[in-house]
Amino acid sequence: MKKFCLIFLLLALTALHVKGSPIPDEESEETEDAEQEEDAEEEEHAEEEAQEDGDQTQDTDQESDDGQEETANQGSDEQQEEDGSHGTDETDDEAAGSRTEDVESGGDEQNDGEENGSQENGEEVTGGEDDSHGAQDSEGGEEDAAAQEAGGKKSKGKGAKGGQGSNRAGSSSGGEESAAHTYQEVMRILNGIKINAKEPLKSRLVNGLQYLKVDTINRVENIQKFSRIEHCFGNLDHIVQLYAGDAVERNDYCKGTCIDMVSNEFRGQMEELTSRLYPCLQGGYY
């Protein structure tokens, strides 16, 4: 009897135990597995997102660092360019200043040299003019002597005819209102005209002036009264100096390459001036 009770009790306990333990359900197991898989996928997805966020953050930081480096490099390059440009400008300014000083000093030295050369040329010109004056005076003396001899002969010839030559000879010996006096006065005026120029232009201008002198002397050789033609030479020297100064300026401008043209034009101006003198000189015969 006790055995049956124990067996029954064991059976009851077994039944209770079986009843209290959950019966495994396949659907619940599948649900749990799916939930676990979803949780694992969510965790993986979260890890991937976190990793992507980290990569993006790292890329952003890298780009920011690169931008800062580029900005710094550009700033340094600009600073170097500015420094270089300032240095170049300063160097150019210094070089320009030195060149300006050199040019100014060279111009001063050149001006000093030209002044010294002009003084020397002036001394040489003065000597040459003195020589030319001596030669012209000697020529003038010879011509005066020849004119006086011719006047004496004419006076003798005319004195034999009617005594007219004696009056002319007397006026010639007196040196006033005579052809000889007119000649001397005109020569004095013409010889007083000077050409201020440097060689080789000066000699060419003097040759052109010589045409004016010779032609003028030939036109007044028979004029008895110088007082009638004296006004014709009032501004002659001034006009010649204007023409000569213009010739010097033009020759200096072309640096001597146009000296032939300048000399020929000056001679033409002297010929024109002679033709302008002719009507005035004709008044001495009346």
UniProtKB/Swiss-Prot annotation:
Q: Segment Disordered: which positions?
A: 17-179
The positions flagged as glycosylation sites are 116
Superkingdom, taxonomy of origin? Eukaryota
Among its keywords, does the record have Chloroplast? no
What processes does the entry annotate via GO biological process terms?
suppression of platelet aggregation in another organism
Q: Which InterPro entries match?
A: ALL3/gSG7_salivary-like_helix
Compositional bias (Low complexity): 166-177
Keyword Glycoprotein among record annotations: yes
Mind telling me which Pfam families this protein's record contains?
Aegyptin_C
Sum up the protein's function in the record's words: Inhibits host platelet aggregation induced by low concentrations of collagen via blocking the von Willebrand Factor (VWF) interaction with collagen.
The similarity annotation says: Belongs to the aegyptin family.
Q: What is this protein called?
A: Simplagrin
The record lists the organism as Simulium nigrimanum
Q: What is the lineage of its organism?
A: Eukaryota, Metazoa, Ecdysozoa, Arthropoda, Hexapoda
